[in-house]
From Swiss-Prot:
This is Probable RNA 2'-phosphotransferase. It comes from Thermococcus kodakarensis (strain ATCC BAA-918 / JCM 12380 / KOD1). Removes the 2'-phosphate from RNA via an intermediate in which the phosphate is ADP-ribosylated by NAD followed by a presumed transesterification to release the RNA and generate ADP-ribose 1''-2''-cyclic phosphate (APPR>P). May function as an ADP-ribosylase. GO terms for molecular function: NAD+ poly-ADP-ribosyltransferase activity; tRNA 2'-phosphotransferase activity. Coiled coil: none annotated. Keywords: NAD, Transferase. GO terms for biological process: tRNA splicing, via endonucleolytic cleavage and ligation. The keyword NAD applies.
Amino acid sequence: MKPERKRVSKLMAYILRHSPEEFGLRPDVEGFVSLNELVNALKTVYPEVTEEFVREIVENDPKGRYEIRGDRIRARYGHSFPVSLDHEEDTESRFLYHGTPRRNLPSILKEGLKPMKRQYVHVSTDKIEALETGRRHGREVVLLVIDAECLRKRGFKIYKAGKNVRIVERVPPDCITLAV
């Protein structure tokens, strides 16, 4: 019997983004680990996991969180340790979105969006996805609209990290408006 896909995916994200060493994995500078070694690490919690199952998770992930190259796998974004990412630059998006609990609004409007414990700020090309992401951190969520051209004019590069996920070093407050 296969374990629940969502649970395995969450564990994959935890391992690949935050704590590979806890499972005996050593990522390279781009965050890749051996696919076989990841499968073995996942089996310590979910013994039924197979490489095929992990590949299905990667192929069907709605946000494009993972990437497989040959016999290696990595998280495409969200790392809390330094990783050299080689993502394509997004030069076309006009507006990006970020959902956040209302309680964070005063500091965001004053200081902008910062990566906090991660390498980059995560934003979305999709309003609904941004709101859903924000709801993981609180019930009363507001939608921030980010002017991508404003970011580019200030020298910030926006990278395509997932299907609708974009990452940027930070977002200054003057590039943010509150959606109505």
